[in-house]
Amino acid sequence: MDFYHVKDVPHGEVRSRWYTSKVTGQTRHIMVYTPPGYDADREKRYPVLYLQHGGGEDETGWVRQGRMNFILDNLIAEKKAVPMIVVMEKGYAARAGAAPQPQPGGPGRGDGGAFEDVVLKDLIPMIDSAYRTRPDRDNRAIAGLSMGAGQALRIGLTHLDTFSVVGAFSGGAGKANPKTAFGGVFADPVGFDKKVSLLYLHSGTVGLDAGIHKGAKALYEMLQQAGVKNVAFRDLEGQGHEWQTWRYALNDFAPRLFQEKK
């Protein structure tokens, strides 16, 4: 239960950064976690996890409430997870000159895909130029919680030339049809498994997560029946739509990332 506590281990650094978005025409703020030793070895490059918050939150949520930096520090110190960069962006966007959104929305839910374009056209190129990343799909993952889970699924699964791992915590699965969902990405199970090293679904079991759990489990079972192998489903019994659930999700998800294929 202490996996998200501050321990006597090497610590990474959480960096606050501003950058200019061509999509929105505005300056945007992000949080970037760099792992222990990032500044010591100027030659080493790292894989990147793009990690999204939920509705009503912002790019600081995963650090201030999720304690993601301490979770990663501890996993890396225990050699359970590989050192990685984690990027946290604000999940709302409007195109330059567009009217403000009446309600916050993820990709395909009112912003006309603006946030999706921010990630693909602005954020990733900036991160790859500003940090020592491994700039290829095999070393790039996207995940999120609640609203961010839906964003991760849509952006990740419809851009498999960019991402090889997709994670959804407490959201996004719904009643997806394996043959048509996300542009039909699941229609060819063998092809999907060649491109995606992991599709990870996680949920609590009570409160708001009770319905989400049902949908995520159903999608997982349908994908397994369809022949998709690189999909995992985990739940946290007795926990709901809350940060404790998502801390556990990240703690289980991160060790699965960027491992060498056996």
Annotated model-derived regions:
Residues 1-262:
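Non-catalytic cap/lid and distal C-terminal segments of serine-dependent acyl enzymes
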